[in-house]
Amino acid sequence: GSGGPIDGRGPIGATTAWPAGGYRVGALDRSRVTEVFDSGIRSLNALTTFGIGQRIGIMAGSGVGKSVLMDMIVESARADAIVVGLIGERAREVSDFVTRHMAGDRAANTAIVAVPADHAANLRLRGAMLATSLAEHLRSQGKRVLLILDSLTRVAHAAREIGILLGEPGAARGYPPSALATITKLIERAGNSEESGGAMTGIYTVLADGDDQNDPVVDTARAILDGHIVLSREIAQRGQYPAVDVGASLSRVMNDIV
């Protein structure tokens, strides 16, 4: 069942439960963003600055370096805890990611929630919610948490499958309204908590099919995110990683915290 350990390291010794739907921090309960989040990557810190508790998107087409950038952030970012949600990825890619990041020092403060592409749509959608809930639980303990969700596009695909099965008519390129609303609700759950003093910084990868930056999922995510990092295929083909397109990327809070 969902929530069970799959790493062969024994049972999870949890004594508390947290709802998959989470406890979204209301706008009036969020503390102001005042500190820069240190991603550990100079180009991101300098060119696409974002703060602790912000929601940031990584937008790119297939094979442009999203996974490379995500690996770099997991290894270099400064946070009390890191939660990675791998949703709808191939089982081999999930296995490779776990092998790379759960054998070294990062394993002590990193949790991975994985629901590969061969699982049912409802499990893939629940996996994204569980990863977010775990990050929320750690935030409620006063920790500064980094949530990385890969990817919002796969989450939207799962929500679209469920919506179509329930008879909901498709709208933008076949996505029913509930599918796009689902990713919006996931993003809104990140932020700083005034009550606990904890923070949850969200980084969400978005697959731009065919490098189309006007894809419905890209548009929906961009509208609510506090900033986004666009990866360029042209820059990647020159062998420059991370292939950040500075002109297309955006930090909406740079003036406030720098």
Task: Label every PLM stretch briefly.
Residues 1-75:
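Short, glycine/charged-enriched hinge/interface segments at domain edges or termini
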